[in-house]
Structures are given as C-alpha cells and as structure tokens.
Amino acid sequence: MQALILAAGTGKRLCEYTQNNTKCMVPVNGVKLIDRMLSQLLKLKLNRVVIVIGYKGQELMDYLGDNYHGLSIKYVNNPIYDKTNNIYSLALAKDELQEDDTLLVESDLIFDDGMFKLLLDNSFPNLALVAKYETWMDGTMVCIDEDDNIVNFVPKAAFDYNDVGKYYKTVNIYKFSKDFAHNKYVPFLEAYSKAVGNNEYYENVLRIITFLNNHDLKALPITNEKWYEIDDKQDLDIAEAVFAEDKDIINKYYGRYGGFWRFPQMLDYCYLVNPYFSSSKLLDEMQANFKTLLTEYPSGMKVNSLLASKCWGIRQEYIVPGNGAAELIKCLMELDNGKIGIIRPTFEEYPNRLEKDFVVPFVPKFRL
C-alpha cells in the first residue's frame, strides 16, 4: 500500500497564507497540514508516499526531503500547475498509481487520525470516504444506494438544493486497488483528458466509471469523524476551531460571537434564539417573498414603530424600535450595582457590561 498526495495547486483563495508556500504548508493551530497528514500516514506502515507538486514545489521538497521519519517520499512535478487542474496532476502520476494499492488524498484536508484506518479496515478494494451533506460543504457530491454503491457523482455545476437530502460529500480520500487503477481508472483518465482537456477534476473520471458500472467503487460513509477542507481564509478559521486542543476549544468558539450554524454538531446555548419564532406561517410567507425582501430597501423606524403598534396594540409614541437585544441588555445591567452570577457558556453581552470583579462565573464541565 502507498499514498498519493495531490499538492500542486496555488491556493490563491488563502491569499497571504500561500504567498510563499503551497497550501499543505499552511499551519492549523501551529501544525502544518502536510506534517499532520504524513504523521497519520506513518502509522500505516506504507511502502512509500508519492506527492504531486507544482506551485512552490521546491520549497516543499526542501522542507520534507525524500524521507519523512523513515517514510520514503517520491515527487512528481506538474510544471504547468497554473494552467491545469488536479486531473492533470493525477495523470502525471499514472505510472506510480498503477504500481501498488493506493490511498489517494488531497493535501488541503485536515481530519481525525482514524480516517485512513477506516479505509484499510474495510475489505472492499475501491472506496471513497463520504460524509452526509451539511450546509458548509462545497464541491462534488455523490448519491449512493442501500448497498453503498455510488450511483452518481454530482459536480458542483449540477448541485440542486432540492436534492440535498440525498447527497453525500466526497471527503477527497480514496482507496484504489492496483487492479482498479490499471484496468479501469487510468485508461479512462487518459481518454477523458484527451477528449475534454486537462483543466478538469479527477472525480469526473470516477463519475463516468460509476455511470458504466456502479459496482466498481463503493462509498464508505463516516459518522462522527471530524474533517475539513481548507480552500480559503474562512475555512482555515473554522478548521482551527474544530481541531483546537481541549484547553483552547472554548475560547475558539467564544471568539466567534455566533454563526454556530457552521458547526452542525454544536448546540448553541449562548445566543438569543427563540424556538417559537418564526412561526411556520411567517416562514412560509418570508420564503414566498424572499426575492422582494432581499432586493428591496426596507422601511424606516417610523414605519416600523407603526407596525409594532398595530401588532401589539400599543400607542406608537411609546415604541422605540431597537437594533437587537444588546441595547436592552446594556440598560438592564446598569440597573444593578451588585455582583451577578454568570453560567458559561453564555451570551457574552451580559458579562461584557460589568467590571470583572462583579462577575461570579460558573463553568460546568464542557466537552464537544
């Protein structure tokens, strides 16, 4: 068994983080992606690792050398990385791909230590790790049947929000047998590149193979394993929260001040949300008028106070619309001069309105 890592891309969306290095050299919580990945591969007793390099490839080679703590590394260079996509990078490594059973992985991933082992412990020779669709996911999706056969690859251009209940996201970690690579994948890869071009994705080849015979490649759905694909600065920020050490994780989330829908496994007890609002009828009305609400300019405060007066039967002159609960919390906290107990996690507007000596915190045992 060998591993093949695709690491040729420029990572432009990471801006200053990739100005002088390739994406896999970007640190997450102080550890470079490539160091984390190779450390995980070290535990598998592989024959070697093949890395396809391109942008800042020499810097990566200088950093890693040809041996990583006893793990042999072979490099394949993509000299036109700025004009091609990962299908070309993989095509350059087609000979290496056919020499051994292979774990194929993209270099901009961060994931739990057990992910590779999931593939190796499964007896099926050709597998794609997939995760049930969540709102933060982007890129290629798949649909699978009851036997975990991949029946369709859904490219980004064909994504349909009406079908998200059927979608699984490819984690971009695969296991290919030597036989599959030699007899199926590489022949189709060569034909596809010749017919369509080199500025494509290697998963498009898998899409064709599964269309012709969906029993060659199975999906392996993950459950609670953590992973993230780092394409831009926001991805990096989220990944640093998801993969923070236990001692840092609370502060990583506190510092976000909301937006916790990006972490679907988290229950938010900090911020002011109302499970009874909006009503189903109001949601339906908003959805029906979404385009108007999004594109038209809203009314001013005078009209808002009039509408509130109509809804609640209060004289308009007694109503002052505010910009959220934070304005009311400021007034509330100024009414009490004593110490106030705060259970954490909490809505930080409460303790932020008090001097430190007037806050009595209670922090229960916390674990994600």
Language-model features: where?
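Conserved N-terminal catalytic core of the sugar/cofactor nucleotidyltransferase
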Residues: 1-5, 31-100
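N-terminal nucleotide-binding beta1-loop-alpha1 segment
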Residues: 1-18
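Catalytic metal- and UDP-sugar-binding loop of GT-A-like glycosyltransferases, i.e.
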Residues: 6, 105, 269
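Conserved beta-loop-beta/alpha segment of the NTase-like Rossmann-fold superfamily
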Residues: 68-140, 146
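Conserved core of the sugar-phosphate nucleotidyltransferase
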Residues: 112-196
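Conserved core of the PLP fold type I
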Residues: 294-368
